[in-house]
Amino acid sequence: MSATKLTRREQRAQAQHFIDTLEGTAFPNSKRIYITGTQPGVRVPMREIQLSPTLIGGSKEQPQFEENEAIPVYDTSGPYGDPQIAINVQQGLAKLRQPWIDARGDTEELTVRSSDYTKARLADDGLDELRFSGLLTPKRAKAGRRVTQLHYARQGIITPEMEFIAIRENMGRERIRSEVLRHQHPGMSFGARLPENITAEFVRDEVAAGRAIIPANINHPESEPMIIGRNFLVKVNANIGNSAVTSSIEEEVEKLVWSTRWGADTVMDLSTGRYIHETREWILRNSPVPIGTVPIYQALEKVNGIAEDLTWEAFRDTLLEQAEQGVDYFTIHAGVLLRYVPMTAKRLTGIVSRGGSIMAKWCLSHHQENFLYQHFREICEICAAYDVSLSLGDGLRPGSVQDANDEAQFAELHTLGELTKIAWEYDVQVMIEGPGHVPMQMIRRNMTEELEHCHEAPFYTLGPLTTDIAPGYDHFTSGIGAAMIGWFGCAMLCYVTPKEHLGLPNKEDVKQGLITYKIAAHAADLAKGHPGAQIRDNAMSKARFEFRWEDQFNLALDPFTARAYHDETLPQESGKVAHFCSMCGPKFCSMKISQEVRDYAAAQTIEVGMADMSENFRARGGEIYLRKEEV
């Protein structure tokens, strides 16, 4: 925890300096590589961790070494992870997907914005200093066309996005030759299909079946294609966003870049304060990962925070505004039905979802059905025109372990399954949001219920938190549940930071939440038996046994913390080549002793073997050459 608390002015200045001096930066001893596909422009970034050789013998003067293969890993950092790319936040990122979108010929540029709110913001000269300067001209589908990845998949079309994803999901594991590194324990996949090699056709088939989604708004061409589905690597989402009491555009852009650097596969902008529209534009134009939002938050701002004053018209305008900016997925709380609200009355913690409570209050005050449910087909029509995926929100998720798996939670889940089928009628991609607070023994039921009632659409959960007693450590309490539900089949995990239930996360909190959830996601991939998931673990274990300290730091999810903790005990440079670990010291290091035992055993085997051969030689008469019948 920081010893000195920065003022608001200092925080903004620090964030401004961060984005003004931003450069493409590689992790220690890593380099950016690209693997090209067969379709034009498919060039998939990965991070390759370079390793030092292993000492295998020789003398002090002439040591003998064996090279260790570089380890390729999935990289979400986009251009921010490539030192060869010049970064300019004022201009935004290169439009990677624009040629693919244009080549399909099914979109058209809009001469005027569809949202009245957007028109008003653009006409306000007072916002010029805040506004992102390089605004895109938004596109939408031509009349009678659908531009979603689900639509293309159902037509049998393998898009460049699908080929990009296939290469990315394989993580370059075909480059690894060592049998030691390729060794992997069998997993327990709970029905997931995990092919040894992911092809573009497999990606297309999973998307066509609704088991996976590719969040890829046609107005967010800067994003690098990624996929969310239980038959792929488990993904992690990070939440950022300003509020009425804290943060600024500079700080949110800083948190976006920071999130992608530390492994966020998607980022949700949950802004509720001033300048939501302008903040989101800066985020989208500088984001290499899909961006999600909860549109009801901004719609509520438009009616001065009074839930009862919300209207379908205000919400529709917000959807159009955000779709034309480039938001890749919307969280929509359309499953909070009027008849479900009384089911929460006996709960210990009631309705804890912000979106869920807004819609529950609206339903009760008007005594009408949820207008998101009533207008769901119109929502789907909008999404189909821009390829905005739907994340069907769990507005009635449990907010305490006591309320887990109750009637209200599962009633809403079943409704989300009904809405999924409606969205699929419009070729709109769908994932399902899940809890929440659930004790460990009750977690698996959430996954089985979702698979059965939501037709195997991808599941996306907040944790779940497995206990309620650890404020300040809820990244741990939820990381446990996240690892479990990821193993059972959850496709994406929404991170929880140490500030959960306590305050808004800062930059360091974002990192802590992401590292925790990258651990959970990776543990789930290992448990499922995802092909290649164990390569990095094996490389780390080999480096650890061989006392290759620099390689251990560099293979870590957080090399900087690993190095810092080691250096607290062994700060000298000699400590980084020492053949003992920093915890046990030279005489009690278990791995050093194991190496000595291995060397001794090998020597003993040779000695015993030579003695046996000597005895055999004497028994045969001591002849150098054997008779033919003795061979």
UniProtKB/Swiss-Prot annotation:
MF term (GO), any: 4 iron, 4 sulfur cluster binding
Cofactor(s) needed: [4Fe-4S] cluster
Residues the entry annotates as binding substrate: N239, M268, Y297, H333, S353, R354, G355, D394, G395, L396, R397, E433, Y460
Cofactor note as given: Binds 1 [4Fe-4S] cluster per subunit. The cluster is coordinated with 3 cysteines and an exchangeable S-adenosyl-L-methionine.
Positions annotated to bind [4Fe-4S] cluster: C581, C584, C589
Gene Ontology BP terms: thiamine biosynthetic process; thiamine diphosphate biosynthetic process
Keyword annotations: 4Fe-4S, Iron, Iron-sulfur, Lyase, Metal-binding, S-adenosyl-L-methionine, Thiamine biosynthesis, Zinc
Protein name: Phosphomethylpyrimidine synthase
Role, per record: Catalyzes the synthesis of the hydroxymethylpyrimidine phosphate (HMP-P) moiety of thiamine from aminoimidazole ribotide (AIR) in a radical S-adenosyl-L-methionine (SAM)-dependent reaction.
Subunit structure: Homodimer.
Pathway the protein contributes to: Cofactor biosynthesis; thiamine diphosphate biosynthesis
Coiled coil stretches, renumbered: none
NCBIfam families: PRK09284.1 (NF006763), PRK13352.1 (NF009895), thiC (TIGR00190)
GO (cellular component) term, any one: cytosol
E.C. number: 4.1.99.17
Pfam families, per database record: ThiC-associated, ThiC_Rad_SAM
UniProt record similarity statement: Belongs to the ThiC family.
Record's keyword annotation contains Nucleotidyltransferase: no
Residues annotated for Zn(2+) binding in this entry: H437, H501
Catalytic activity from the UniProt record: 5-amino-1-(5-phospho-beta-D-ribosyl)imidazole + S-adenosyl-L-methionine = 4-amino-2-methyl-5-(phosphooxymethyl)pyrimidine + CO + 5'-deoxyadenosine + formate + L-methionine + 3 H(+)
